[in-house]
Regions:
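Glycine-/small-residue-enriched capping loops at alpha/beta junctions
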Residues: 2-4, 11-132
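Phosphate/ribose-phosphate-bearing ligand recognition and processing surfaces
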Residues: 12, 107-197
Length: 197
């Protein structure tokens, strides 16, 4: 099956397609459809669960690619996990990225439980950690928009708005890259980026 083709019921995927980017001050916000575990950036964000013990989706893919040292480090440094809306950092282990920023986004409950503020906080916590670590490039997945059920359109809007607000201030981060697996999610992020313009 050619790249980008999908059988009925499967997610459409185009590997490593970048077609949307904006510049804010000295920084850029990019959209890529691809594999976050292959990103050659200083730090990648992980859509983690509060226990920080690995899981499915992006979290599972990052744990598999990083190797067992990632889980061992999480167990040692963060035995009690971290609350929703926060992030913690580990080494990248076997990943191309130097660091992994484990962000805990909210489970979607219809938008009545402060999900928007918690999602923005998860993204902002990663960006703050990246700055503390000296990272100049950060790649994000679509936090909470998988099994946690956050709708992609409002979720993408929160993600790109939070990144744009952050890089508009004082930061050493020069590249914020959203690495999105499905074409639908990529399109929602492109819509969110267009709304900034």
């Amino acid at each position: 099956m050619p790249a980008g083709a999908a059988a009925t019921g499967q997610v459409r995927y185009r590997p490593e397609v970048t077609s949307t980017a904006i510049t804010i001050g000295a920084s850029s916000i990019e959209l890529v459809q691809g594999d976050i575990t292959r990103q050659a950036v200083d730090a990648i964000a992980n859509a983690a669960n509060a226990a920080l013990r690995g899981g499915g989706g992006v979290d599972g893919a990052i744990h598999r690619a990083a190797g067992p040292g990632l889980l061992a480090e999480l167990r040692e440094r963060y035995p009690d996990g971290t609350p929703t809306g926060t992030a913690v950092a580990t080494a990248g282990h076997n990943l191309p990225a130097r660091w992994v920023l484990h962000a805990v986004g909210p489970v979607w409950s219809g938008g009545t439980e402060g999900e928007e503020a918690l999602l923005a906080s998860a993204y902002r916590s990663c960006l703050e950690l990246a700055d503390e670590l000296g990272a100049t490039s950060v790649a994000f997945p679509a936090i909470s928009m998988g099994i946690y059920g956050y709708p992609p359109h409002p979720g993408a809007r929160v993600a790109v708005r939070t990144a744009a607000e952050y890089v508009a201030g004082e930061t050493q981060i020069r590249v914020v890259r959203f690495v999105l697996f499905s074409e639908e999610t990529y399109e929602r992020f492109a819509d969110g980026l267009a709304e900034l313009g």
